Amino acid sequence: MAKKSMIEREKKRIKLTKKYALKRATLLKKYQTEESFNLKLELHSKIQKLPRNSAKTRIRNRCWKTGRPRGVFRDFGLSRHVFREMAHQCLLPGVTKSSW
């Protein structure tokens, strides 16, 4: 199980990302379409002044049950260990063990 501080840090990042998503998107759009070099520098500095954790790339997918950061299935939000256990217990609807 992951440390609670790491899980809380991820929650904080998700919250910040949602808060600054619109502002970041508009600044990036202006930056990409701008032709003037001086205005581009100004927009770049505004983007850099936004909180670092408000960037979407800083978010790490974690298992919602254990907080494990690696081996997470996106569809279920579970790590591979928990996914296997829950699938064996028939707690995941529509998931069956394959056989051929």
UniProtKB/Swiss-Prot annotation:
Keywords carried by this UniProt record: Chloroplast, Plastid, Ribonucleoprotein, Ribosomal protein, RNA-binding, rRNA-binding
Gene3D superfamilies: 1.10.287.1480
Main localization (coarse): plastid
Signal peptide coordinates: none
Gene Ontology annotations of biological process type: translation
One example GO MF annotation: rRNA binding
PANTHER family: 30S RIBOSOMAL PROTEIN S14, SMALL RIBOSOMAL SUBUNIT PROTEIN US14M
Family: Belongs to the universal ribosomal protein uS14 family.
Subunit structure: Part of the 30S ribosomal subunit.
Protein name: Small ribosomal subunit protein uS14c
Organism: Phaeodactylum tricornutum (strain CCAP 1055/1)
Originating gene: rps14
